């Protein structure tokens, strides 16, 4: 991935090898690898492709998965993945009741990966949740490993408070927990201004008198609660990493790509430069955006403009077509500020000689000459090389969440959702991936549940390529991916069956 430049600095705490690991390093649990097999998989020369065992391993929806280690840029495969079926059930004690005055305070206990509620078909008081995730680590695998173990727990915890609301799709979510929800068929949730000034309709103080609505209330759909739960879970996961890095060795940071299936809809949450696409009838439907210094230029520049102290008097928030030279002071040069999508000319000043906040193009673009992704988890100790300037204030843990309603379409066995880290997308276009999958799957036995794993393996092989005298090469003798590559192929037809 477009991660950390060599030589970037870490803080004095949270990065020492003397601290214990939060979780031991390993490959995804669902691969079922022994320690010896994990060691053998870390061959940077042969780069064996790991897949699910046909005999013993099966993921939900017959999901396919394959991965391969990098060509030597890091000792370990810094990608991580997890896939689980969980059961969302209201917490004992009534999480949906009116919260007490202390409910907004931070929890005293944090998720530890234990006690996740697995699917239980005998219980009708909750909702089944399907979960897939990919984490692309940089500057170490610590954050990616921790997130792969705990992020699903945070999502589950956020959903537990609202599970009863989500199950009752006929009624809009209440504005305040503990209130009787309004039925949109019988209550518009609005009053005229005159009626609101009179205090509403009905006898004051009467038990049947609804709460006074002074202005129109927003009608919040149920899927927005799920989106909010996922967004909150990402934030809580990042805060947990920040807290625990002082007592555990949680190295580096990671991007995060998560898919949650709940009540007939897929929620695709992305923070970083991994990517998700749906292939339906051969058509590509993008389900994520990449978050890089280029795509988030204006957000980063605006933050630096509003809080210039974050630049440490070493960087300028302005963008120029190239580095400004001292001999150009006083001349008019092209530039871009946070409020601009186009370019204009400005008179070069002394401050413009500072290194630009964002420098480089494409995969070489970096924030403060250090990191190539702008959203993800971790990186709390990341600093500009040989300085005390922290980069974390410019990085966001907030994901973009897109929703795909499976109930709107009838999907065939070759309609799939592809999730992959940037090791795949750096060398293959969306259309190339779609063409490969649509050509591969029809040649497999439609009754073979392993066909999606074989499709994932085929994609990894196409991106890795073959080792030749001039390195790893793919079709048309293009340079293959030397990065870690992880791929899910998720058949959508199983989502229709679940719904």
Mark where each language-model region is.
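PP2C/PPM-type serine/threonine phosphatase catalytic core
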Residues: 2-131, 137-499
